[in-house]
From Swiss-Prot:
Catalytic activity: 6-(2-amino-2-carboxyethyl)-7,8-dioxo-1,2,3,4,7,8-hexahydroquinoline-2,4-dicarboxylate + 3 O2 = pyrroloquinoline quinone + 2 H2O2 + 2 H2O + H(+)
GO MF entry, a single one: pyrroloquinoline-quinone synthase activity
Protein name in UniProt: Pyrroloquinoline-quinone synthase
Biochemical pathway: Cofactor biosynthesis; pyrroloquinoline quinone biosynthesis
Record gene name: pqqC
UniProt EC number: 1.3.3.11
Keywords: Oxidoreductase, PQQ biosynthesis
Family membership: Belongs to the PqqC family.
GO biological process, one term: sulfur compound metabolic process
HAMAP family given in the database record: PQQ_syn_PqqC (MF_00654)
């Protein structure tokens, strides 16, 4: 006998309860928040997270391409503009590059993606490929880790200037801008999710989709922990060179 569907309030509570697995609790992020991260670890995180940032518009474009609802598209497209930039606005990707410069990285090196670890690349690529293959509703719902994003952005704004005075203040603009953007995006994504998943089976699938996205974010930090905390980057027993691939054209 199938279980009854959760009502909207119960379903939303179940979604929010997934926050216990958000990457704000990963030891690598905790170390950054508590001021225990080295300059090299901060730089490694910024360089690798850039790959996630530049792929978010591709994920959102896949959702738009699969969505026949014009009203949804008109609202969702703002996410692409937030990252790529609208006319006269730099956008989030440019803001991230300024963060990279603020922590002492060369813009060209970050853009080259030469420091992106294979584990990070695999995790991000899995997310983008999911958005391309899934229904637009499922892909849109996978973005609901944004439920927990304002807290993580605020934690960086609260702790990093105190612990890492060597980071130039101009680099924090990305985190400031995402505070409002993430809250707006949550409202839209949550509305789509609560309206679309009406059966218990569908709701359980959505919770698993959200767990998949949480797995993506956690796995990225696992790869960075291996490379920058344990000092075991890929092929460390063979070479100290970055011999790993930098993305293959499809």
């Amino acid at each position: 006998m199938s279980r009854a569907a959760m009502d909207r309030a119960e379903f939303e509570r179940a979604l929010r309860d997934k926050g216990r697995y958000y990457h704000i609790h990963h030891p690598f992020h905790v170390a950054m928040y508590e001021g225990r991260a080295s300059r090299e670890q901060i730089q490694g995180w910024v360089a690798n997270r850039f790959y996630y940032q530049v792929n978010i518009p591709l994920k959102d474009a896949a959702i738009l391409a699969n969505c026949p609802d014009r009203e949804v598209r008109r609202e969702w497209i703002q996410r692409i503009l937030d990252h790529d930039g609208a006319p006269g606005e730099a956008g989030g990707i440019e803001a991230w590059l300024r963060l990279a410069e603020a922590v002492g990285l060369e813009r060209e090196q970050v853009l080259s993606e030469e420091r992106v670890l294979p584990g990070v690349r695999f995790a991000v690529d899995a997310y983008v490929n999911f958005a391309r293959r899934a229904s637009w509703q499922e892909a849109a719902s996978s973005s609901l880790t944004e439920l927990f994003a304002p807290q993580i952005h605020q934690s960086r704004l609260d702790s990093w200037p105190r612990h890492y005075p060597w980071i130039e203040a101009a680099g924090y603009e990305y985190f400031r801008s995402r505070l409002a953007q993430a809250r707006r995006d949550v409202e839209h994504g949550l509305r789509i999710t609560l309206e679309h998943y009406r059966t218990r089976e569908a709701q359980e699938r959505m919770l698993d989709i959200l767990q998949f996205k949480l797995d993506v974010l956690w796995s990225m930090l696992d790869a960075m922990s291996m490379a920058y905390e344990l000092e075991r980057p890929p092929y460390h027993t063979v070479t100290r060179e970055r011999v790993w691939h930098r993305g293959l054209a499809s």
